Structure formats: structure tokens, C-alpha cells
A protein has these predicted regions:
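N-terminal glycine-/serine-/threonine-rich phosphate-binding loop
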Residues: 1-32
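A glycine- and small-aliphatic-rich helix-loop capping segment at beta-alpha/alpha-beta transitions
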Residues: 45-57, 80-82, 144-153, 213-215
């Protein structure tokens, strides 16, 4: 595990974008595992800046996203399909045929999970997986106590996750989807490099627990202690307890 300490959110975003940029430059046809949520947005902004400056070319890049809400049409403004297009895909030259997310409108969970696992296999696996971390240690939508050996699966979101995500749905908990498709821990651990971004004092406790405590399904992110190429990039507040 490599830890990169940064002074603030902007610096964290810049460092994370540097690592992703290097991956694209070194392997133009790389497979990027991408994440949603507030934390990676700054890194995506930096990647768009570098693309606009002529420093990055996404034309051969393939993306596979971590997760998607089940039952939400992709055109919904809070679907992760919409999030990724709004924050990254619409602003760079990635081939739409190379963009992959779970299909939240496929209500046949078994078939959709099997399909998405096959998509990831067919592109050769993930070269670099970007992650955030939840206050309870979840990564993707792998919630506490989920088995470490799962591939893509359908999950019932915990009340804590639903509460955390209601800010994206006008603060109305009833509008937040209650299920999601997510890459499993096994899939994440098979990525050749894993990059986690974390910021703010609110994440300090879980960072300490996940990366300096026992490896346990109770804290899904703790498994990353065992990954051979895991980079944690955080600001001073998030890393204040380690």
C-alpha cells in the first residue's frame, strides 16, 4: 500500500489525475474502472483539462463503471450513466462503444450480473480501478458483511448508504433507489492497480479502521490492504489519524 498525502481536495484531485493520466499515456488502450460520487469529480475535471490542452487521448480507452442503481433509467439525471457523461465522457474523445456500465433497467438480476462479468472479462480485466470509500467502509456498493469472493451482484442498499445518497435526490429518501448492481470485491481485487481518493475529516476514522485495522468483511475496503498495487491519495484531514 502506498499512501500519498495532499494538502487539500484540489491537490488530491491533481495527484489522482496524474496517476490516471500516466496510465492512459503508458497504455493508450487501457481499461479504466471508474467511480461516481463527489470525491472523484475533481480528478475528472483535471482529466478534462488535460484532454482540452492536448495532453490526453481517450480514443482507445475502455471504461467499466463500478456500479449503477437498479431500476433507474440511464437518462435519469442521477443515474451513474448520466453522472459519468456529465462529468467526463461528454467532454473527452472516448468512443461510446467503449463505455460500459451495469444496465440498471435490466430487472433480471442474475442475467445482468452475468452479462457485466463477461464484459469485464472480454476487455481483459481492469488496468486501473478508481475508488472512493463510504463512511462504513463500503467500496462500490459492496456493503459491510458482503462476501469478499463475489463478482458483479445485486445489493440491497443499507439505510446509511440511502441516507448518504438522498442529497442527490432533493433530500428525499423515498426517491433514492433501494438496490444497485455493483462489481464485487473479487472483481475489484483483480484490477492490476487500485487508486482510492479520500478527503475530509469525516473519512478519517474509516480510513484508519480500513487500512490499519483487521481485514474483515465488516469493513469491505480493508481487503485492499492485501492488494499488490494499491494507492491511497488523501488530503490532510482524511489522513489525520494515520
Amino acid at each position: 500500500m502506498k499512501i500519498i498525502r495532499t494538502k487539500d481536495y484540489a491537490d488530491m484531485s491533481r495527484k489522482a489525475a496524474n496517476i490516471i493520466s500516466a496510465q492512459i499515456i503508458m497504455k493508450p488502450d487501457c481499461v479504466l474502472g471508474l467511480a461516481t460520487g463527489g470525491t472523484p469529480v475533481g480528478a475528472y475535471e483535471k482529466l478534462v483539462e488535460r484532454y482540452n490542452e492536448g495532453d490526453l487521448d481517450f480514443s482507445e480507452v475502455t471504461s467499466v463503471n463500478l456500479d449503477e442503481y437498479r431500476g433507474l433509467p440511464k437518462e435519469h439525471p442521477e443515474s451513474y450513466w448520466s453522472f459519468m457523461h456529465r462529468n467526463l465522457f461528454d467532454h473527452v474523445n472516448i468512443d461510446p462503444a467503449h463505455i460500459n456500465l451495469p444496465d440498471g433497467t435490466n430487472m433480471d438480476a442474475e442475467a445482468e450480473c452475468k452479462r457485466y462479468d463477461e464484459v469485464i472479462r472480454s476487455v481483459g480485466g481492469v488496468d486501473l480501478q478508481l475508488l472512493g470509500i463510504g463512511h462504513d467502509g463500503h467500496i462500490g456498493f459492496n456493503e459491510p458483511h458482503d462476501a469478499f469472493d463475489l463478482g458483479t451482484h445485486c445489493v440491497d442498499l443499507t439505510q446509511e448508504t440511502i441516507e448518504a445518497n438522498k442529497r442527490f435526490f432533493d433530500g428525499n429518501v423515498d426517491l433514492v433507489p433501494k438496490q444497485a448492481y455493483t462489481m464485487g470485491i473479487r472483481t475489484i481485487m483483480q484490477a492490476r492497480k487500485v487508486l482510492m481518493v479520500v478527503n475530509g475529516a469525516g473519512k478519517a476514522e474509516i480510513v484508519k479502521k480500513a487500512f490499519f485495522g483487521p481485514v474483515t468483511p465488516e469493513v469491505p475496503a480493508s481487503i485492499l490492504q492485501l492488494h499488490p498495487d494499491f494507492i491511497l491519495v488523501g488530503d490532510e484531514e482524511a489522513l489525520s489519524l494515520i
